[in-house]
């Protein structure tokens, strides 16, 4: 919310201001703009950047950087995607979520568990099938004579194995999705990540990702599968 950001910077100059990922700051020139005009101290980078791009931005960034570490994977350029607004009539930038809780509805039917967003069917799950949070980009749709995830399958971002590289790049904080998640989810993920970061800081040279960490995080992963997302892309 640019108006709130401007008001806070003008009226409370000592208030620590963090730029949301919805600010879509993908380069250091953008970060410099927000730093010079609003005095931000930290920014959350979008999930579309590769690790090399994160390192390049961090090298010249005038503010602290925070990156996504675990949670729902987004393949869109955050802050610039309005796909869900065609169903909800609200921008994710102003309501804070692609699928506002008030628009989400689950319905058990004779042919499966249906997920609806503002009453529009976006997926149907068979008994025993893992169900992801209903977002339009991860819905299953009929294209031609086939029904499948036309844009993206439900998958969770898990970068625990990148802790050494992220610290080396100078990243100050990792972001774990907690909004619209259960307390049990948050407790499990935060506990595992706390252990991993502490172990790395104790002995960086001998850091290895533990099998138990992967198993614990897999239990709460969307779609029961994880990925490093854009961090390891080559283009």
Regions found by a protein language model. Give the residues of each.
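Non-catalytic positions within long, well-ordered alpha-helices that form the structural scaffold/packing
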Residues: 35-36, 167
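Conserved N-terminal glycine/acidic-rich loop preference
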Residues: 1, 29-32, 40-43
